[in-house]
From Swiss-Prot:
Coiled coil: none annotated. GO terms for cellular component: nucleus. Residues 1-101 are annotated as: Disordered. Belongs to the krueppel C2H2-type zinc-finger protein family. It comes from the Eukaryota. One of its GO terms (molecular function) is identical protein binding. It is found in: Nucleus. Keywords: DNA-binding, Metal-binding, Nucleus, Repeat, Transcription, Transcription regulation, Zinc, Zinc-finger. A zinc finger (C2H2-type) spans 271-293, 299-321, 363-385, 391-413, 419-441, 447-469, 475-497, 503-525. One of its GO terms (biological process) is regulation of transcription by RNA polymerase II. Transmembrane segments: none annotated. Residues 24-50 have a biased composition (Basic and acidic residues). It comes from Homo sapiens (Human). This is Zinc finger protein 837.
Length: 531
């Protein structure tokens, strides 16, 4: 180590300084000199530094080259910031053995080539790397200069991360600039220092650390955000870090980016029905629902007199009539037709739907040639031929081909009968049963047979009667193959195979498979027929 010391003395350093540096190495070989000792004497002032930069050199006003507190000789890229710990950047070429003022920490050897440091976790071959190992806090990585990959030591208390823009690599032993990205000096004769903003945990950059701290505190108070796949919650600083991709959820393996927390919608006011307790968000929906309990049907068809609870039901019903009854001109199919609401007298212009105008039935069944005005009606009808019953009752397992039939069947499992007759106080589980019962009081029979002219109170009774003329028997026994017109006839027939006798006499206890047989038996006892 004597040859480098003599070389440093010949290069322009005063002997006193060289001897002082040698004495410092003997007393404290592992610790650098305090920064306060070099602020007045050994470190060049900012004014002298600017004058040196203007001339392309960094020599202090005294003339000779002097080293800084870390023992690194000032070079073309060395610069000190006023009021803070000096930023040391060594050129890219010289190795640690060419700087006699640099105190090598224990565990590192002054040699040519790369060195291994466990504190940094990699190879280093430059004096700036050794300076960092010497004075950097444990576990902290030196910052990177923007134009070149040199590491520059930065004091931890420095609020601004100042980065040299005039940094260039140089050849070993020379000071000639060779980096093509070196900016030109400014008009004042110095190269500017760029403020490198600090990145917060959320990715937002702040130039001053004082602005970054309130942002970190604000993020610490935010609610955890759940993962979109597994629901596990993460804090914002765990979800998105500066310059890094979002973390991977350990439960589902998916990345979860921060999402804005959407507030819950305000609670809606509900209007409940006094009869059944069903709630609605609008009063108009509640009024329409109450007509089911009261039996009110204000919308009546002008052709057949059939009434409906809603105006939409009347509109769908009017399309079932023939086109001749609704046709009011030769160009009605190409123009809008007038739909009238008799209760309120409102008439609105509406255009017939494509393929389903007034009286038109474009959808025809391929099996029985029955036509329908809507495609959804054809789909429901096709289940009659295919035997598909996708709607099953969760109570008894009975399946149906339509959802409406399942809804009516589910009422049979409950004992509630909300539909009561105002004349005889007889109650029913469904609205259709109440309507057919009221026709028994009025004597109304709106459904007539086209073959024999017989009238019926309900549409289902008319369909069952028409099967007598057509000979259709859709209900077949699986045990013996016998067919029936009505489903109730098939149910009574199945009791002959199962032996079920649900109707028992209250006097003698004799049971029967049909209610009619029980009534005949009770007449022998002189009693009334079974209810």
């Amino acid at each position: 180590m004597e040859a480098p010391a003599q070389k440093a003395g010949q290069g322009g350093l005063p002997k006193a300084d060289a001897q002082g540096a040698s004495g410092a190495r003997e007393k404290r070989p592992e610790e650098p000199r305090p920064l306060e000792e070099d602020r007045a004497g050994s470190r060049p002032t900012q004014k002298g530094d600017l004058r040196g930069a203007a001339g392309g050199r960094t020599t202090p006003p005294g003339g000779g080259s002097r080293g800084c507190s870390l023992g690194v000789s000032p070079g073309p890229g060395t610069r000190h910031s006023a009021g803070t710990r000096p930023l040391v950047r060594e050129p890219c070429g010289p190795t640690s053995s060419q700087n006699p003022e640099l105190v090598i920490p224990e565990g590192l050897q002054a040699r040519e080539g790369p060195c291994r440091s466990p504190a940094r976790g990699g190879d280093c071959s430059r004096n700036s790397c050794l300076a960092w190992h010497r004075g950097a806090p444990a576990g902290e990585t030196p910052p990177v200069c923007d134009p070149c990959p040199e590491r520059i030591q930065n004091h931890p208390r420095t609020q601004l991360c100042e980065v040299h823009t005039d940094c260039w690599p140089c050849q070993p032993g020379t000071g000639a600039p060779t980096c093509p990205r070196t900016p030109k000096p400014t008009s004042r004769g110095r190269n500017p220092l760029v403020e490198q903003p600090r990145a917060c945990a959320c990715g937002e950059a702040f130039a001053w650390r004082a602005l970054r701290i309130p942002q970190e505190r604000l993020q610490a108070t935010e609610e955890p955000r759940p993962c979109a796949r597994c629901g596990k919650r993460f804090r914002p600083n765990q979800q998105q870090q500066a310059g890094k991709s979002p973390p991977v959820c350990p439960e589902c393996g998916q990345t979860s980016r921060p999402r804005p927390i959407v507030p819950d919608p305000p609670a809606q006011r509900l209007y409940a029905c006094d009869e059944c307790g069903k709630a609605f968000t609008r009063t108009s929906s509640l009024l329409q629902h109450q007509r089911i309990h009261t039996g009110e049907r204000p919308y009546e068809c002008a052709e057949c007199g059939k009434a409906f609870v809603r105006c939409s039901g009347l509109y769908r019903h009017q399309k079932t009539h023939s086109a001749e009854r609704h046709r009011r001109g030769p160009v009605l199919a190409r123009r809008a037709f007038r739909l009238g609401c008799p209760p309120c007298g409102d008439y609105s212009e509406r255009s017939p739907r494509r393929g389903s105008g007034a009286g038109e039935k474009p959808y025809e069944c391929a099996d029985c040639a029955k036509a329908f005005g809507l495609f959804s009606h054809l789909v429901e009808h096709r289940r009659v031929h295919t035997g598909e019953k996708p709607y099953a009752c969760p109570e008894c397992g009975k399946a149906f081909n339509q959802r409406s039939n399942l809804s009516r069947h589910q009422r049979t499992h409950s004992s509630a009968k909300p539909y009561a007759c105002p004349l005889c106080e007889k109650a029913f589980k469904g609205r259709s049963g109440l309507v057919q019962h009221q026709r028994a009081h009025t004597g109304e029979r709106p459904y007539g047979c086209s073959e024999c002219g017989k009238t019926f109170r309900g549409c289902s009774e008319l369909r069952q009667h028409e099967r007598l003329h057509s000979g259709e028997k859709p209900y077949i026994c699986r045990d013996c193959g016998k067919a029936f017109v009505r489903n109730c006839s098939l149910v009574r027939h199945l009791r002959t195979h199962t032996g079920e006798r649900p109707y028992a006499c209250g006097d003698c206890g004799r049971a029967f498979s049909q209610r009619s047989n029980l009534n005949e038996h009770r007449k022998r006892h002189g009693g009334r027929a079974a209810p």
